[in-house]
Amino acid sequence: MIDLLVSILSNPSIIIALIAGLGLIALRKSTSDIIKGTLKTLFGFLILQQGAGIIVNSLIPFSTMFTEAFGLTGIVAEDNAIAAAVQVVLGKETAFILIFSFLINVLIARLTKYKYIFLTGHMMFSFAATMAIVLSQMGLSSIMTIVLGSIIQGISMVLFPAISQPSVRKVIGNDNVAFGFWGSSWISLSGWVGGLFGNKEQSSEDVKVPKSLDFLKDMSILMGIIMIIVYVVTAGFVDTDTMNEISGGINKYQFAIFEALGFVVGILILLMGVRMFLAEIVPAFKGIGEKIVPGAKPALDVPIFYSYAPVAVTIGFLAALIGGLIVTFMSSLLPVAVLPSVIGLFFMGGAAGVFGNARGGLRGAIIAGFFLGLTFSLLVALAYPLIGLSEYGISGLWFASPDAIIVVIIIKLIGLLFGVPL
């Protein structure tokens, strides 16, 4: 039974489809509308996931190319691999924290004015694993790890969407959805910084170009050209033998071009899924809200914001990559060298670009992305000594979610008050 609950709560597509179906039932829709709405929600979310998968698969070889091109060594921020690796040792604790934290989230939303329901399953799973690791390393028993971990995560599942909601409102223009992602506070902060120095009147989506370059107004064309340049230039710095290993013997420039185009295709698929998914889940979620948590807002994953400023996504990602690289080259001054986590910097940097654009236009998108890449990488480097992962057989990886890292720092500081060493 526990395994089934964990499986359901760890799979966001199942959660989303069930909630859509229940919401439509609560709204007393016809059987036809319930089936149609549930399946379209599921299809939209699966399309979104497929798009994200294509993006990740295009970024993996690029990340390898990038590391080889510039001879970088150090740690990479990556949550999911860590969460999976510790399940042999902390699987029970992770599972119970995941389940009870969701119940606490719903209870808080029901009893308080903070009506956010966190629905990003893989984020819930990685945070639960993080709590299990941190609290068990502080010497707590399994039961206390589960109790405290569930309470901390349940509160965080409401707190961080609440913190980011004013910024979400700036992006989407309403309160229909919230931000269910463990980087929401950092992305919101980055967007705010971008707004301080930007110009809201000059949106990244309205960049003026000469008539001869009018084709650049098409988001997919602009993104394709930019990513081809980035991939091809990076491939040019990789030696032929190494590049043959990465590409499987395909000409390195041909490989780079098609991986870049694959990235753009992933973005286009993701955006199509986002539009289909949001069109169904928002009205369905109102049905749930009316019956269980009046006024409930679904806190959803980061890609839902990309469709509001697609050009800003690319701008934010590239700016974040530059910011992350600066920290990498500062490694002699830091506890550890943090390699640019290309996948993490895309999802967070892209969102920072969108949030920065909403507050400060094109310049805001650039500044927000750069600020996120720089400060996120610094946060990882400076917090790295707080948690050791070698006892789980993990090396070269560390935590990648700024919100979770902030919570870990607070837990460690409170532990110090009770005599628990860092």
Task: Mark where each language-model region is.
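Juxtamembrane "helix exit" motif at the C-terminal ends of alpha-helical transmembrane segments
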Residues: 226-244, 324-335, 349, 353, ...
